[in-house]
Structure formats: C-alpha cells, structure tokens
Amino acid sequence: MSTREGSLWGGRFADGPSDALAALSKSTHFDWVLAPYDIVASRAHTVILYRAGLLSEEQRDGLLAGLDSLAEDVADGSFTPLVTDEDVHAALERGLIDRVGPDLGGRLRAGRSRNDQVATLFRMWLRDAVRRVAAGALDVVGALVAQAAAHPEAIMPGKTHLQSAQPVLLAHHLLAHAHPLLRDVDRIVDFDKRAAVSPYGSGALAGSSLGLDPDAIAAELGFASAADNSIDATASRDFAAEAAFVFAMIGVDLSRLAEDVILWSSTEFGYVKLHDAWSTGSSIMPQKKNPDIAELARGKSGRLIGNLAGLLATLKAQPLAYNRDLQEDKEPVFDAVAQLELVLPAMAGLVGSLTFDVQRMAALAPAGYTLATDIAEWLVRQGVPFRSAHEAAGAAVRAAEQRAVGLDELTDDELAAISPALTPQVREVLTIEGSVSSRDARGGTAPARVVEQIDTVAATAARLRERLGGPA
C-alpha cells in the first residue's frame, strides 16, 4: 500500500491507496503544464479569502510571498513534482507548505475544490493556447497570401474529381486554402466568449458557503464572468470539445493544403519545386526530394481527429456532476495544441518557400479540354439555350479528341458544322487568359477579382490577429 503523502484527501481512510490506484490516479506527468496558472489562481484566491474575512492581512501577505517564491522555483525548474504527488494541485500545495508552514499553507484550500480549480485552470490554459494556435494558422495564411500576391496572373489547371476542369489563377487556388484557415481562426475568436466563464467558487459542485465572491475572482483571473450554475461549471467540458474540434478542423484544412503540395511536387504534376530547407532526402535513392512536412501534416490530421473523438467519447455518458473520467479531458487537448505548434510553423515555411513552375502550369491549363465550359457559356451569351450549348460544346470536345487537337485548333468550318452559332468570334474565349478574365463576378477567378480577394484576405487576417491581441 502507498501512503497518502502528496494527496489532498484521506481523513476518512484508514490506509493509503494501493500502489496500482496511486499509479492510475497520478497526473503530474501531463497536468504540470497548469502549474503557472494554478499559482496565479491561488494568488487571486488568497485575495478573495482576505476580502471575505477568512485571512488576516498578515496571513494574506505570507501566502502571497510564499506563492511568489513557489512561482519562481517552478519557473526555473528547481521545484518539480515528486513521485508521491498525485497531481499538480497536490504538488503545489506541498511546495507552498514547505515555504510557509502547514498552518498558513493549509488555509488556502478553504472555499475551493479541485473540481472548480482544475476546470478554471484548464480554461485559463486553453484561452492562451488557442491564441498561439490561431497565430500559427494566420502565419500560414500570410504565406499563402504572399505567394498569391507574387503570382497575380499565373494560370493553372483547376480540377474537380482530380480531373482537369477549368483554368483558374494560381492565386485564386492558393487563397482557397486561406479562407478555411481564416474561418478556423474566427471560430477561435468566437470560442473565447464561451471559454471566458470562470468556474472558480463553484466548489465541488454546490458552490461555497464561505462568503466568497465568484465574480471578483473571475475578474482577477481575466474572465468575462463567473458561471451561473456550479454543477455545470465543474462538470462540463464542452469548451474543451469545442477547442478540440477547431484543432481537428485546422488539421483537416492543413491536410488538404498538404495534399496539394504533395501532388504538385510530384514528377507527374511538376507544378512546384521544394526548397532544400523544407524537404528531405532518401537513405537509398540519391535523387529524391520528399515533401515530408506536407506528409506529416497530413498524417497528424488523423491524430487531431482522434483526439477530438476520444474526448467526446469520454464525455458522452457521465452523470452530473464531476466524475474522475474528466482527468482524461486534458491530454487530448494538450496533445492537439502540441502537434499544431509543430505543424503550423513548418507548413508556413513550406508554403512560403515553394517555387512555382508557372510556365508548366499555364501549358497544362487547357489540357483535358478545360475550355469547353467557356464555349457553352459563350453560346449562352449569344442566346443559345444552355442545354443546346452544352451539347454543342460536348460535340466540339468529341471532334477535337478525334483529331487529337485542342479546342482552339478546330477550324472555323469544323466549329460551324457543329453549330451555326459557333462563329469565329468564339475564339475570344478559347484562350486560358480569356477564360479566367471572363469569370469576373464576385468570388470568380478573374484577375481583378483575385486582386481584391488578396486584399480582403490580408485585411481579414490582420483584423483577426488584432482581435486575438497579437501584432498585425
């Protein structure tokens, strides 16, 4: 049997927990990241206890001095958990008692439970963590915008079903990866409204009878408000699940971008060249330059999805209020943040370092008869019903395939034989430049619209960064 050393409970137990139980319960190997937040919250709690008349001025000052000393030792690594410490809370209480004595150190626990304490600390940590993730996502957006701005007129094959579809601007395609990331960051901004609610003062589940002020400690800790329901405050982790979803969504969005880079850098596509600093080689094939960053980003998206699924499964069947299952809420979220903090800067660097072969992309843009839609829409503008126009454009493709030529290489007579409406003027849309320029509605791939889009995306990113409290 183990002892109860390092535990915050045990008065009604004759013996300590078994070694197996102690090992299962131990969480300092992952929750120690909450230690700085725990100390900040304990400082605020000390002030609230003093205001409630539960501490004298001398006791308040003694606790604050002890917490300051403990914070310094945690920061420089001279104070760390012992193997006997059950969790971050127990370790820090031990450290405080070592500095101020058991009588004074033991007073800090009045009016709070680990249930409201850890729920608060988790929110504090997560509110900071999502800002770091958002900043990383905006860096990827910045790299996409920079590449788009550097290639305002480059044309590439647009694809659906991975088949050649219509010509589009490279910048338009790159910005199509930026928009989802902007929405992810916007979700993070919106998430903070729900995360900025403090559970502190809720106790184990029923609130406190000691005259403490939850709103006051919420304000001290930078929360917008205190929780309205103490049971909900201690037992709910929807804020963690919401963050885990956004992290998984960022992973999915990065994975789609990564997939494009992987395809584009292949010999068969040949759209981009990878920079030496952002790619790897082979242990046996000297010629290889591998898109490892993109492949790892694609692989880690599955891990992020798994973290979300695991967290939701943990939450799905717990009765109110707190259950020890909730010890399992933090590792998936901590891991998701850690993975994104690795992937995001790597993806930003990868995107920013890509060298595009714009001549090859332009040469491939009309391949696969991607101008067929332009023929159909040109006929519609001449008054031909779209059904008939679609059939005529399809017939033009068939004729070009039979001769193994491009649509622009069909003769005037061949076009007229397909449809009398196909006059020589149709050739104005049988270029990739004419095709993209014609798509001038909002959201289209016309150069003028894409230039506007670059400005809009850059401005949106700057606005979101400002709302998150970071430099523009």
UniProtKB/Swiss-Prot annotation:
Q: Which reaction does it catalyse?
A: 2-(N(omega)-L-arginino)succinate = fumarate + L-arginine
EC number(s) per entry: 4.3.2.1
Where is it found, in Gene Ontology cellular component terms? cytosol
Q: Which residues cross the membrane?
A: none
A Gene Ontology biological process annotation? arginine biosynthetic process via ornithine
**UniProt key word Transferase:** no
**Annotated S-S bridges:** none
Q: Which UniProt keywords apply?
A: Amino-acid biosynthesis, Arginine biosynthesis, Cytoplasm, Lyase
User: Protein name, please?
Assistant: Argininosuccinate lyase
Tell me yes or no: is DNA damage among this UniProt entry's keywords: no
Q: What is its main location?
A: cytoplasm
